[in-house]
């Protein structure tokens, strides 16, 4: 904060936060367990998340190996995963780099995943410059657990897998 003050940077904004983070722990009311999440982007690039019940975070894997932060050399983890499905297409920009465009204006479908559970959501964006709003299927803006969040935008036909064990407790 001191660096911001020294450089006369703004420390407040009139913009609404992108996600509705809440301090109280969000426990999704659903039977859909999400211990493993697999997102195939192509034949050679699949992202996988595995839930750790002790830390209540997901470890991220890319191309079959734990993803490691280059700067800190620590394993990449996240508290929340938001998956949205959007129509994608090749940009013919002459670069030859395989860049993709996304049709993300309107209402999209997806999932919110946290604490080993998943719910279906919608994502609404009214214009290119508008903020995306994430809602549950009842139309309420979702409450997101405090912590890191990965937003995964997937091709509309991606075969995302969300798996979980139906755990039972014995007394």
PLM regions and their residue ranges:
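A surface/extracellular/periplasmic glyco- and lipid-processing/surface-interacting theme
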Residues: 1-171
């Amino acid at each position: 904060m001191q660096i911001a003050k020294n450089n006369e940077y703004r420390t407040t904004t009139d913009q609404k936060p992108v996600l509705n983070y809440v301090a109280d722990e969000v426990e999704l009311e659903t039977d859909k367990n999400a211990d493993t999440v697999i997102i195939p982007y192509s034949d050679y690039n699949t992202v996988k998340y595995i839930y750790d019940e002790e830390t209540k975070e997901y470890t991220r894997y890319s191309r079959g190996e734990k993803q490691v932060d280059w700067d800190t050399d620590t394993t990449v983890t996240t508290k929340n995963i938001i998956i949205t499905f959007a129509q994608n297409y090749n940009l013919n920009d002459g670069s030859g780099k395989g860049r993709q465009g996304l049709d993300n204006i309107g209402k999209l479908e997806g999932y919110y995943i946290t604490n080993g559970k998943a719910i279906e959501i919608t994502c609404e964006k009214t214009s290119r410059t508008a903020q995306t709003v994430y809602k549950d299927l009842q139309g309420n803006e979702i409450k997101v657990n405090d912590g890191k969040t990965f937003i995964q935008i997937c091709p509309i036909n991606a075969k995302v897998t969300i798996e979980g064990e139906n755990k039972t407790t014995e007394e």
